[in-house]
């Protein structure tokens, strides 16, 4: 419990310091802050997103789909990619979890030791949903200023990614989140490197997400 308390404190400090570097979180802490993954807030081609509740803040935890050919080497590459991406119009990456445990499972009539892998990414919580849902719900009376702010923010975020030589590959309204001030924040860039064509269910070709 003492280790979890110190981890939780470190995570909360990262949220208050924009220059703090992401660190590794334990799977036990992730399960604790998500109440054992009880509140799903998003579902995409790469994983399920759950709400994480800290003492004074909220976070979003993405639990990645793990297939047999999932590459940990590419997972490390993508964590490094997320660490590099620091911009007001990019969803902020906070921490990651890479947990591997052995588990006895029954196979062909006997028990064998199986490897159970969990790979998770922790991001800032962006409260106002995604651009796709916003567009569906807008009325003709919506102010042009708000729309212009969104367009401008998306352009700034995309320009930054390209400057950092990071290719998004799947920019669409679902992958643009809106914060409390309706500022757009781009998410889900680069993760395609972790998945092949069949797994991602989003991309039409297998192109690296970073160069």
Task: Set out the residue ranges of the language-model regions.
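Helix N-cap/beta-alpha junction loops of NAD(P)-dependent oxidoreductase domains
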Residues: 194-195
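Pre-DFG segment of protein kinase catalytic domains
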Residues: 185-188
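Catalytic-loop of the protein kinase fold
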Residues: 166-178
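Membrane-proximal cytoplasmic juxtamembrane segment of single-pass receptors
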Residues: 1-154, 163, 199-200, 204-211
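A short helix-coil junction within the Rossmann-fold of NAD(P)-dependent oxidoreductases
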Residues: 160
């Amino acid at each position: 419990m003492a280790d979890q308390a110190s981890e939780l404190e470190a995570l909360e400090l990262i949220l208050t310091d924009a220059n703090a570097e992401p660190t590794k979180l334990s799977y036990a802490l992730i399960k604790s802050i998500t109440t054992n993954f009880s509140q799903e807030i998003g579902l995409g081609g790469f994983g399920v997103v759950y709400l994480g509740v800290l003492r004074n803040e909220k976070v979003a935890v993405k639990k990645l789909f793990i297939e047999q050919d999932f590459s940990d080497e590419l997972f490390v590459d993508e964590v490094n990619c997320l660490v590099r991406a620091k911009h007001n119009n990019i969803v902020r990456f906070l921490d990651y979890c890479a947990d591997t445990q052995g588990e006895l499972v029954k196979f062909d009539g006997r028990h064998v030791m199986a490897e159970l892998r969990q790979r998770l990414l922790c991001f800032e919580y962006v409260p106002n949903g995604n651009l796709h849902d916003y567009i569906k719900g807008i009325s003709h009376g919506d102010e042009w200023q708000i729309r212009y702010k969104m367009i401008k923010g998306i352009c700034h975020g995309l320009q930054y990614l390209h400057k950092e030589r990071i290719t998004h590959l799947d920019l669409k309204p679902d992958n643009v989140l809106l914060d409390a001030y309706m500022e757009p924040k781009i998410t889900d860039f680069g993760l395609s490197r972790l998945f092949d064509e069949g797994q991602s269910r989003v991309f039409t070709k297998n192109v690296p997400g970073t160069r």
